Amino acid sequence: KFFQRHIMKRRRSPAADAATPSASSDPMFKTLEFARSLRTIRDYFNLIDKCGEGAFSAVFRARPLTGGDRCLAVKVISQCCDLQRTCTEILLLKALKGSPNVISLVSAVREAETVLLVMDYVEHRPFVEFYRQLQPDQVQHYMRCLLDALSRVHSMGVVHRDVKPSNALYNPATGQFALADFGLAHLVQQQPQRPRPAARPAAVGSAAVFPSNKSAAASCRCASGLVCGPCLSKRPIRAPRGGTNGYRPPEVLLQADSQDCRVDTWAAGCILAAFLSGRQPFLWCRSDTECLYLLCCLFGLNSMRSAAAAVGRELRVLPVASETLPEAEFPCRRDRLSSVCRLIRGTEAGSSDGPSSSVFDLLSGLLQADPAKRLTAADALKH
């Protein structure tokens, strides 16, 4: 009842606000000490330990002071985080409450410069501790739970935007699963996409764009001499870029306008690839450019150019880089993914110990560079 009366905002005296530490200015914001100093937590919870953290939040395992065996997760969000994003997260969790395989929100409270989200705690293990040891039927169960959660989220017109192993809580011993952290989630835009004008390459020679080492040494100022004037004069592209390196699909890397729920199914495919290859993350990269290069190596330069054109973008490659990339699209995407995963894992082709070909059919459908050809979560569940 306390939480129902104090959803998001409540009136407090200036003296009470002054007595509460500031999350935005305290460098110890993510510590147990700071969380225990909050009045709501002091009065109603016994914090046990910290079980996770993000850029603007920390999650603590807790039990209610009223007793009982119920274990809760208390997410402490700093007001450094966009308040609108926090409101969206609360509204989405409230709408999804009761959905299987999705974290359940108990309540939310605002105290001074922090917002507390109280959720059911899901006993789980870090992904890196079990993803190499799971049996095929356990991997199937994990992926079915993940795709089921995404299907339910997507059916409400919501895209998660940050699907990754640390946000997919899983207990291998019990099979319990919960999709968590909706901090980047938002509603899919329903307005029709405006046609984009055809890309027009700058009418400059390669010598002007890529000067020789001799001329570059004399003219370059912090590498600006390597970029042509037309490129510098273009307006910066504004498009959603939420997510984590290694799990962003090509349309996000290319900052395309058209992004929908299949952003999440690409990330689910990256998780499945980690299971099949034994490498986490499957696409290890430090930047969007590096990730695009890896995708060109994996699928072929022509395939990625076609995918870029499908979302209204043009993919250009430096001449020195194009020499090391496979030009043609591989004839069978499934076989290409299978050979790469087996090579990384050290499994011989045709070995009975390796995954079945059907799972690579699913992986191929999830890791389609063109989002229009990519499987939705609902379609993947029928596989």
Roles of regions detected by a PLM:
Residues 154-170:
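Catalytic-loop of the protein kinase fold
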Residues 3-40, 48:
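Juxta-kinase regulatory segment immediately upstream of eukaryotic protein kinase catalytic domains
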Residues 58:
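Conserved N-lobe ATP-binding subsite of Hanks-type protein kinase domains
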Residues 98-107:
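Conserved HxN/HPN-centered segment at the entrance to the catalytic loop
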Residues 142-143:
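Activation segment signature within eukaryotic-like protein kinase domains
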Residues 223-236, 301-362:
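C-terminal lobe substrate-recognition/regulatory segment of protein kinase catalytic domains
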